[in-house]
Amino acid sequence: MTTTTASPWIKRPRVLPEARARLFCVPHGGGGPSSFARWVPGLAPEVEVCLVHLPGRESRLREEPLADLRLIAAHVAEAMAPLLDRPFALLGHSMGAIIGYEAALLLPAAPSHVFASASPPPHSVEEEPPVAHLPDAEFLAEVRRSYDGIPDAVWNDADLMALMLPSLRADFAAYEEYRWRPSEPLPCPVTVLGGKDDPLAPVGTLSDWSRLTSGICRTLLFDGGHFYLNEARPQVQDLVREALTTPAPAPAETKGLG
């Protein structure tokens, strides 16, 4: 599969000049663009999938990861800007949902849709005791306690975990330091996606994303925990395709904060 991109921050595994829309996928903390690789054929040819690629992982492994969520979002928005010549949506998972939200606020064009997966809304993220500063063994124990979707084979591979450690630590630091700032509501519909048994994004917190958009906001739940999306991918792909290839409903009354 050939990757074409004008920026290291956005991978375009399959460029589709005739696509009706684009989907920008933002991975979870510590994750790379390959976590969304199976979405590329799943949405073609109607939707071109663009993968957000943060430094410090996969082919950018030798680059220093960033520990500032707003700075990350600014880089993502800058890389997206040349690709907004047709309807587009963002889909972020876990910390990626917060990055996607912050990037959407900076874009020169409004998204057609935002999909927020496995994340409480940014204004209601509960502060947890910080762990990013802990010694390696303690930090990784906390990561393993939090994440239910990383295979044992990965945890048990000391060399692989050593490669992943800097980006994991930077992402946890970015999330721990992030504080939401009141902003204009997103001018587009938002679909919130969650796992019914996700302890990191409790079901009761998800509907509060509605306060961050002037459009319609709906919440959809799936069986599973924090990485429910691995099994629910086909259903969510259908939702994305429908949202990007059918006319959007009229905006609802503004529900913004601030």
Q: Can you name each region flagged by the protein language model?
A:
Residues 1-91, 95-258:
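Domain-scale detector for complete catalytic domains at protein termini or as standalone homologs
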